[in-house]
Amino acid sequence: MIRLFVASAVAAGLVALATPPRPAETVVVFTGDIRGYLSPCGCTKPQIGGVKRMASVVRTLREDSEALYVDLGNWTEAKGRQDQLKADALAELFARLKPNYLNVGAVEARFDPATLAALDQMAGGLLKSDALQAEFLQPTQHAPVLGLAPSPEAAILPMRKPEEVLAGRPDAIIVLFAGDRASAVRLAESAPGEGRVLIYSHRGDPPKEPMRVNGWTLVTPGDKCRFVGRIERVGGEWKNLRLIELGPEHRDDSQAHAIYESYLMRVGDENLLDQVPRLPSDVKYVGSEACRSCHMDAWDVWTHSAHAEAYATLESTMNHRDPECVGCHVVGLTTVSGFISKEKTPSLKDVGCESCHGPGSDHIIKPTVSMKAGPESCLTCHVPDHSPGFTFAEYWEKIRH
């Protein structure tokens, strides 16, 4: 009898082992909240993120399965001409990636109809919204994806409230909501969510585990194009969340690379660097060479440091005309007496003495004027996005003087 029981148990175990895992009914690859972060700056390595790696990973994930690809929106911060150029570049990239749903985020919802229509055209007519009331943005009826955004104060086109739209679409099992976590939780609480996933907007790294609210599964890709998400619907339940960090192990997508280079050329051609607002100052920048005669030891340390080659790193990546990059690779970009160009102000290119110690004109006239610098001098440029892992104690040892 015991032998029969053991044999039956073993047989049952073999049957269980032989049963293949249940296939996913739906696979979703998701991105969003790029916020203008098209590429890591490359100042230090390794860095994560960027649309070139994002495009490569998205293509790979879609090749591996019949995945739906969706983007949450919030392409840029919409703060000026450079963000407009970024939006153009992203529209061109999305036209190549062909997402199943390219959502209008809260940022894009502030655009005027003509700007939105132009972006939609550049994106191959893929821009969609179930909340924003514009005919050219209307998605296919009864599609499994619903695209929503909270209504910004400056919205020009009329918008429907997310809760109202969601209440009328119980068939939508994938909901994109370009609002923060607290707003996403309130939205999830407003409608039953069994078997449904809500992808929301989040500043910072995405939580590694889904949140469960009122039957809903809540996930996010985080911000600044640092992760690509993937999740499966198996047996009516959303599970197997993957958040792929866009590190240097992922190759650059060739089309995205070409689009990014074209964007940099437009930034240069429009001379955005010349349009950086500059503040007046009673003290003036004089260049590191002026410090040499009195501070020879410190000057020698500087000439052998990476700071003295900071501008060249931008030239090697074509970012030397990008105002978002140049400020931390030269002296005094936002001051009237600061860096203008390599040709006009060669003594102010690179991270020089005055980048940390401040303008030196008064000190030259009266050496007793204090020029001391401390850890706070570094933190303007050594921020987590550009200098991950920065600690003053460790980095100071490289330039101690």
How would you describe each model-predicted region?
Residues 6-16:
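Bacterial N-terminal signal peptides
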